[in-house]
């Protein structure tokens, strides 16, 4: 396996190549490495507080007397963001984490409209656990999540006048999409044929009535409606919502794809019918499969590539991967990563994807032997780059999967958050790490603070020869040497630093210059 393909796979299936990871992939080969990754135990989210905020019945504000960090520690997802970046940079289950990150940008919740990090912790741990399981189970846990129920108004949804918000997004964003698709993801016909009607959304909303929060919540005002539970995201089974029969609609409800909720079905029975109707819908495999390709490999996959991935989703098998059950994510992800289009060296302008900010943060830190406690990557760099993890602006994520690239017929989802300001911010991030020294150990409120910084010592050994240094960092970041003209200019810039320009630090300054110019270049910013 070539250096280029090993680095490419590391880009697609991890949070960034390290020299050790690339060596491992080259030794094992793509299939064996993916197999090994799928067998690893998942990392998890552990930080944050419990559900006391939804059990408070006193007067005044819950945070009164609890210190300056109360809102952060109980209400916000910032503690989970610390875990996210620590795990992404350090933990071995790289593939599972990357797939879970893709899923959380498909089945979206956010910390702008809903608060309580203990509930978000449950939700994102489910995505980590199920990211290589089955998409039907992912959807089931999403439907039963009290955080999602709160976010999209399906918790305590009464049969008398059900809120249709969640039902609409279940169809539009989480499963079948809005237009009828061929198996290869292209439109059926010459224009969009809608996949559902308002009446269909209404039927799904009725079918999903009758779910309330798990027991355990309390307020000083009592719970509404009578017989339902108060807002609470904790408890057994990941905090899954529980059924309340009197609030569940038991009328016959026609669903899509030939399915019907029969008269008298309980809320759990109706849920299973809903799941069957969307997981077997012919749109779901190409709609979800294409988005996984876009998050991991390429913004503009060919229809043939989408078709092969959709076939793996439908059959539940790809090579030796999968259980044979429709929606198997291990089979689907293997098809995404091991397909010839993913493994090929595409130089076409339509190939690859703009590296999203999170990938840049983690890619540079991992490549340059860095460390982070996540603190600086939240409000500072996350907000600056418009990808503050766990805080997308809406259920439509940070960017849409069909965001158009101006002046072309291509889409570039990540360009939805890319502009002149964020382009400069990418370079400023490198300046922050390389010239400012990053951030020292964070405040004492962050557990095990290490700050956010890189360690360039391993590269200083090659700094005496600018050509060797530039090629080493290029081979790690890009999987290849820079194009000739670019390489010449980078070597020239790096060579400016000598013992005569800085007798003490010239070698480390060479490393900083090389890293800045390579990681800041279009050759790195566009993942191919």
Set out the residue ranges of the language-model regions.
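N-terminal mature-domain "stem" immediately C-terminal to a signal peptide or N-terminal signal-anchor/transmembrane
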Residues: 1-44
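Active-site substrate-binding loop specific to GH73 endo-beta-N-acetylglucosaminidase modules
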Residues: 26, 38, 50-68, 72-85, ...
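Amphipathic interfacial helices
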Residues: 76-80, 90-98
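Short, well-ordered loop/turn elements at secondary-structure boundaries
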Residues: 4, 132-134, 512
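Flexible, low-complexity segments enriched for small/polar residues
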Residues: 7-14, 281-285, 289-326, 334-528
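Short, flexible active-site-proximal loops enriched in glycine and acidic residues
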Residues: 95-99, 111-118
């Amino acid at each position: 396996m070539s250096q280029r393909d090993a680095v490419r796979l590391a880009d697609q299936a991890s949070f960034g190549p390290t020299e050790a990871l690339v060596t491992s992939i080259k030794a094992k080969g793509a299939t064996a490495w993916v197999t090994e990754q799928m067998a690893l135990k998942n990392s998890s989210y552990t930080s944050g507080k419990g559900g006391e905020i939804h059990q408070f019945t006193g007067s005044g504000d819950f945070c009164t007397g609890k210190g300056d960090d109360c809102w952060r520690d109980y209400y916000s997802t910032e503690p989970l963001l610390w875990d996210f970046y620590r795990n992404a940079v350090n933990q071995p289950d790289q593939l599972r984490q990357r797939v879970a990150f893709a899923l959380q940008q498909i089945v979206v919740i956010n910390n702008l409209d809903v608060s309580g990090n203990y509930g978000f912790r449950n939700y994102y741990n489910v995505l980590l656990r199920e990211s290589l399981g089955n998409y039907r189970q992912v959807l089931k846990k999403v439907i039963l999540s009290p955080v999602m129920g709160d976010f999209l108004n399906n918790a305590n949804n009464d049969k008398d006048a059900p809120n249709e918000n969640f039902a609409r997004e279940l169809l539009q964003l989480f499963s079948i999409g809005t237009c009828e698709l061929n198996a290869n993801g292209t439109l059926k016909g010459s224009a969009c044929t809608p996949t559902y009607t308002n009446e269909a959304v209404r039927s799904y909303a009725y079918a999903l009535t009758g779910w309330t929060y798990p027991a355990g919540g309390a307020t000083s005002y009592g719970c509404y409606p009578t017989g339902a539970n108060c807002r609470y995201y904790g408890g057994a089974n990941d905090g899954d919502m529980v059924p309340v029969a009197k609030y569940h609609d038991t009328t016959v409800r026609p669903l899509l794809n030939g399915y019907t909720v029969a008269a008298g079905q309980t809320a759990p029975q109706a849920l299973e019918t809903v799941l069957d109707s969307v997981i077997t819908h012919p749109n779901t495999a190409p709609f979800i499969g294409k988005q996984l390709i876009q998050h991991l490999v390429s913004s503009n996959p060919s229809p043939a590539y989408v078709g092969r991935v959709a076939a793996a989703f439908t059959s539940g098998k790809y090579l030796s991967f999968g259980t044979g059950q429709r929606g198997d994510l291990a089979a689907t992800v293997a098809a995404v990563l091991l397909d010839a289009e993913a493994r090929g060296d595409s130089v076409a302008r339509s190939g690859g994807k703009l590296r999203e900010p999170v990938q840049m943060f983690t890619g540079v830190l991992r490549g340059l032997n860095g460390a982070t406690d996540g603190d600086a990557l939240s409000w500072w760099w996350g907000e600056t780059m418009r990808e503050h993890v766990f805080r997308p602006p809406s259920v439509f994520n940070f960017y849409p999967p069909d965001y158009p690239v101006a002046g072309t017929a291509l889409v570039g989802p990540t360009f939805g958050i890319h502009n002149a300001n964020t382009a400069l911010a990418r370079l400023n991030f490198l300046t922050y790490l390389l010239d400012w020294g990053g951030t020292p150990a964070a405040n004492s409120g962050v557990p095990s603070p290490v700050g956010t910084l890189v360690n360039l010592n391993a590269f200083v050994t090659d700094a005496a020869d600018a050509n060797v240094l530039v090629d080493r960092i290029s081979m790690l970041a890009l999987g290849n040497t820079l194009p000739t003209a670019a390489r010449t200019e980078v070597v020239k810039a790096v060579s400016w630093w000598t013992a005569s320009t800085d007798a003490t630090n010239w070698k480390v300054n060479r490393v900083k210059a090389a890293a800045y110019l390579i990681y800041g270049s279009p050759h790195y910013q566009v993942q191919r």
